[in-house]
A protein has these predicted regions:
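Catalytic core of non-heme Fe(II) oxygenases with the double-stranded beta-helix
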Residues: 40, 44-49, 57, 61-203
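Non-heme Fe(II)/2-oxoglutarate
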Residues: 1-63
């Protein structure tokens, strides 16, 4: 059964020529949950409750502790203070996003994939690296008509049931998504982002 009430995200990489967006989200906040049918609201409120659970965050922080310590110093996982915000994402064919690191207001980014089978296995998020050569190419691309690739592709997480990824946002957390092809359905996922400030908006 489909869920209504998605919000179009106006990210420049996601926009179609007609002004619509290939990426939509239902933020799990009081406003958007309140617009749902009673059954949907009950279901997604339960998901939000689980994702908000401190034990979930603590487990992520334990698994990602080396990266968190690199960013925040020699802290213990139980001493990390961060605020989870989550939502349901729908990416249509044509969606893409260039390699980016995520904004520094985010401490940890997590994404949980929701395919029904393995047909969309190639739809996962990709990781990249950019060397000194890549940074030079970036500057040359600003003045050249010929655009050369700045990034080297490292791997793509398989978009499979009961899978996903998590990473600490930092200077090298380059990730993105090549264009989703036509005719293979929408890409659904849950994202749960841990922010350092509880007042940062999450697609509100």
């Amino acid at each position: 059964e489909s869920v209504s009430g998605y919000k179009n995200l106006k990210h420049k990489d996601a926009m179609r020529e007609d002004g619509s967006s290939t990426r939509q989200v239902i933020p799990f906040n009081e406003d958007y949950l309140g617009r749902m049918s009673e059954s949907d609201r009950e279901f997604f409120s339960l998901i939000k409750e689980v994702l908000d659970d401190e034990r979930i965050g603590r487990k992520f922080f334990q698994l990602l502790l080396p990266g968190i310590q690199e960013r925040k110093g020699k802290k213990k996982a139980e001493d990390i203070i961060a605020f989870p915000k989550s939502g349901l994402f729908c990416d249509a064919s044509g969606y893409k996003i260039r390699p980016h690191k995520d904004v520094r207001t985010k401490l940890v980014t997590t994404q949980m994939y929701l395919p029904t089978d393995a047909k969309q296995e190639s739809f996962g998020t990709s990781l990249y690296t950019r060397s000194i050569k890549g940074r030079i190419i970036r500057e040359l691309n600003k003045i050249s008509k010929t655009q050369r690739p700045e990034f080297e592709h490292l791997e793509t997480f398989p978009f499979l049931p009961n899978s996903g990824y998590a990473f600490v946002v930092g200077d090298k957390s380059w990730h993105g998504r090549e264009e989703i092809p036509e005719g293979m359905g929408n890409r659904y996922s849950l994202m749960n982002i841990y922010f350092e400030d509880k007042d940062v908006p999450f697609y509100d």
